[in-house]
């Protein structure tokens, strides 16, 4: 608050000890402490009153609006998110009329996509099986190398 370091406080304490005397020094420090406490309380109360007045006036809402308006990155990202959501909902095959040509093509595309996903999953599982088999063979070879031969 006053931006005093330890050396400044020490100098103030020594001067107070010389001027006031050791007998009245605790009373002086107690009174100074009370005064500083009251000053802090008044400052806190003033700050709270100013914040309440600003809240009632709608300053926070205006501030949020200004921040949103001046931050073009968030605005651009909101546009991208909205476009991605719209794109995803536009590709939903259940949205089209099943009797229309578009609905038939969408259903056909959805079926093809399911087949591709199933084939991809099968190929990935086969690859993992091959890799696991190769690792199992390596482990068996390593175990065989560790086993001691028959002693004669």
Swiss-Prot record:
The lineage of its organism: Bacteria, Pseudomonadati, Pseudomonadota, Alphaproteobacteria, Rhodobacterales. The Tat system comprises two distinct complexes: a TatABC complex, containing multiple copies of TatA, TatB and TatC subunits, and a separate TatA complex, containing only TatA subunits. Substrates initially bind to the TatABC complex, which probably triggers association of the separate TatA complex to form the active translocon. Keywords: Cell inner membrane, Cell membrane, Membrane, Protein transport, Translocation, Transmembrane, Transmembrane helix, Transport. This is Sec-independent protein translocase protein TatB. Part of the twin-arginine translocation (Tat) system that transports large folded proteins containing a characteristic twin-arginine motif in their signal peptide across membranes. Together with TatC, TatB is part of a receptor directly interacting with Tat signal peptides. TatB may form an oligomeric binding site that transiently accommodates folded Tat precursor proteins before their translocation. It comes from the Bacteria. One of its GO terms (molecular function) is protein transmembrane transporter activity. It is a single-pass membrane protein. GO terms for biological process: protein transport by the Tat complex. InterPro entries: TatA/B/E, TatB. It is found in: Cell inner membrane. GO terms for cellular component: TAT protein transport complex. The chain crosses the membrane at residues 1-21. Belongs to the TatB family.
């Amino acid at each position: 608050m006053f931006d005093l370091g330890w050396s400044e406080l020490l100098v103030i304490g020594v001067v107070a000890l010389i001027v006031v005397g050791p007998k009245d020094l605790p009373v002086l420090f107690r009174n100074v402490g009370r005064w500083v406490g009251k000053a802090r309380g008044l400052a806190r109360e003033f700050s709270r009153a100013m914040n309440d007045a600003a809240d009632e006036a709608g300053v926070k809402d205006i501030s949020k609006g200004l921040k949103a308006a001046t931050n073009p990155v968030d605005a651009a990202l909101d546009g991208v998110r909205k476009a991605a959501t719209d794109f995803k909902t536009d590709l939903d095959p259940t949205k089209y009329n099943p009797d229309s040509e578009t609905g038939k093509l969408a259903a056909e595309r959805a079926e093809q996509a399911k087949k591709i996903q199933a084939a991809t999953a099968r190929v990935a599982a086969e690859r993992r099986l091959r890799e696991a088999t190769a690792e199992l063979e390596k482990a068996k070879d390593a175990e065989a190398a560790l086993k001691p031969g028959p002693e004669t």
